């Protein structure tokens, strides 16, 4: 990147930094030196995909009540480009110091932890985070945005304690395009964790296994969900192209195409009902 500094008064110069990303917390002579073994990711929308972690138990015979913290938990093993890491779903929380006049909030956030036994270049972890984000776009059925990424090296708890170095944590910031419209209504989510918890680990693993085969479909699907200001006809055309490509992958050559009679009947039906 580069730096622009300008202004009439030297005491109040305006400085603009131009780069692909910022990494705060470390000193690196070159990008190739940034090797890590842990990433903490916070995505939008996922809080409502998992269950609320707090349960309030009200004692009718007393003024005392019980607040229980029981979040969803999940794990999966990920293999990406012949390297491996482990995914853990972690729910962070804050406890209020006192009771407010009108309400007391118990804030929480579901986060995704990626950890590996070996150190890998941070770009590999960012690729895994990107594929994981696409996976949750598919599960939830709306655009998902990365809210925060933290990285660390020497984090692996399975390392030998005698040779284990002090963990170092870094924050990474990317340029973000904020869309004009974001759908947040959780009632429109395609799936929920409580319906998929027995299949979650296997689903994540298979998603990464088949990601390269579905590259065009997944990229197009993500583009549809993240569109901002696209005309309706252009969006519909993109959906048709995506379904057509996906159809070509799933079905064999014998069943890939329908007859002209079936196609004409479908077009007639579509024109009458749209």
Language-model features and meaning:
Residues 103-198:
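Internal metal/ion-chelating core segments
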Residues 161-163, 170, 175-274:
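Amphipathic, oligomerization/interface secondary-structure segments
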Residues 30, 48-51, 81-86, 105, ...:
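Context-gated lysine
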Residues 9, 30, 42, 59, ...:
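Serine/threonine-rich low-complexity intrinsically disordered regions
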Residues 37-54, 145-169, 263-270:
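Short, charged N-terminal helix-start/capping segments
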Residues 1-143:
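Long, contiguous, compositionally biased segments that the model treats as domain-scale units
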């Amino acid at each position: 990147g580069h730096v622009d500094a300008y202004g009439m008064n030297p005491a109040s110069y305006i400085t603009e930094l131009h780069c692909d990303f910022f990494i705060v917390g470390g000193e690196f002579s070159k990008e190739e030196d940034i090797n890590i073994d842990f990433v903490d990711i916070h995505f939008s929308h996922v809080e409502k995909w998992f269950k609320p972690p707090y349960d309030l138990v009200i004692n009718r015979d007393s003024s005392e009540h019980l607040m229980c913290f029981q979040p969803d938990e999940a794990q999966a093993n990920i293999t990406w480009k012949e390297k491996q890491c482990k995914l853990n779903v972690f729910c962070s929380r804050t406890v209020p110091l006192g009771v407010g006049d009108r309400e007391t909030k118990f804030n929480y956030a579901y986060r995704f932890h990626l950890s590996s036994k070996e150190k890998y270049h941070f770009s590999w972890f960012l690729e895994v985070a990107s594929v994981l984000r696409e996976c949750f776009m598919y599960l939830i059925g709306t655009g998902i945005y990365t809210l925060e990424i933290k990285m660390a090296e020497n984090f692996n708890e399975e390392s030998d304690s005698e040779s284990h170095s002090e963990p170092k944590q870094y924050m990474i910031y990317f340029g973000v395009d904020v869309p004009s419209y974001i759908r947040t209504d959780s009632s429109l989510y395609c799936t929920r964790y409580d319906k998929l918890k027995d299949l979650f680990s296997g689903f994540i693993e298979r998603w990464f296994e088949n990601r390269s085969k579905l590259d065009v479909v997944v990229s197009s699907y993500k583009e549809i969900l993240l569109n901002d200001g696209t005309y309706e006809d252009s969006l519909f055309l993109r959906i048709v192209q995506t379904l057509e490509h996906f159809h070509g992958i799933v079905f064999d050559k014998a069943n890939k195409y329908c007859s002209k009679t079936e196609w004409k009947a479908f077009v007639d039906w579509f024109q009458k009902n749209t």
